[in-house]
UniProtKB/Swiss-Prot annotation:
Record PTM: The p190 precursor is cleaved by SUB1 prior to merozoite egress into 4 subunits p83, p30, p38, and p42 which remain non-covalently associated. SUB1-mediated proteolytic cleavage occurs in an orderly manner; the first cleavage occurs at the p83/p30 site, followed by cleavage at the p30/p38 site, the last cleavage occurs at the p38/p42 site. The order of cleavage is essential for parasite viability. SUB1-mediated processing is essential for merozoite egress.
Polar residues bias spans: 58-67, 95-107
Superkingdom assignment: Eukaryota
Keyword Transport among UniProt keywords: no
Stated name of the protein: Merozoite surface protein 1
Gene: MSP1
Gene Ontology CC entries for this record: extracellular region; plasma membrane; side of membrane
Positions of the UniProt region annotated as Disordered: 58-110
Keywords: Cell membrane, EGF-like domain, Glycoprotein, GPI-anchor, Lipoprotein, Malaria, Membrane, Merozoite, Repeat, Secreted, Signal
Primary residence: membrane
Amino acid sequence: MKIIFFLCSFLFFIINTQCVTHESYQELVKKLEALEDAVLTGYSLFQKEKMVLNEGTSGTAVTTSTPGSKGSVASGGSGGSVASGGSVASGGSGNSRRTNPSDNSSDSDAKSYADLKHRVRNYLLTIKELKYPQLFDLTNHMLTLCDNIHGFKYLIDGYEEINELLYKLNFYFDLLRAKLNDVCANDYCQIPFNLKIRANELDVLKKLVFGYRKPLDNIKDNVGKMEDYIKKK
């Protein structure tokens, strides 16, 4: 009788463990798909296209071009672009504001404040629906900037908040992707092709995922880079 009871308990434990693993797997995949869509949409909205704001009666336009040269394939790092099966990336966190250089865009490409505001606000509201507490303050701040044309110009001219948002979204994508690969490490579940971590990404992702837990190491690394930069100058 005791043996039967033990076997039933053991069987229940195995089934329950598999159910928990399955629920964790489904939840992770759902979150990752939402994050992937958010980063790709943000990349298309803010970096792939050029934003030209028509200021109305003045006839002038403010052009925002693709920031930097980060539009290449990334390997899971914090600052890249859309990677095949890897990090879906954004620009860097960008602590200083930048003035985007004007290019060949003409005034005919300019869109009204109402049109651009609608697109940006819809995107930011989608980000809020992801319910990441760490993004609430930033998205609320960006939504406030969208409330008037001067704040909106500040937002799309400087790109500081935009870069920070895309950087954080990409960071969470990499973090959860590493967690998913860990959950499925013992073949409990099958990892979707676009969420797999490949060998050439592993080292970069280790630094990214574990690096945020070691702020002192990150600070030392940043100081070292700054010292090298000063020496070159």
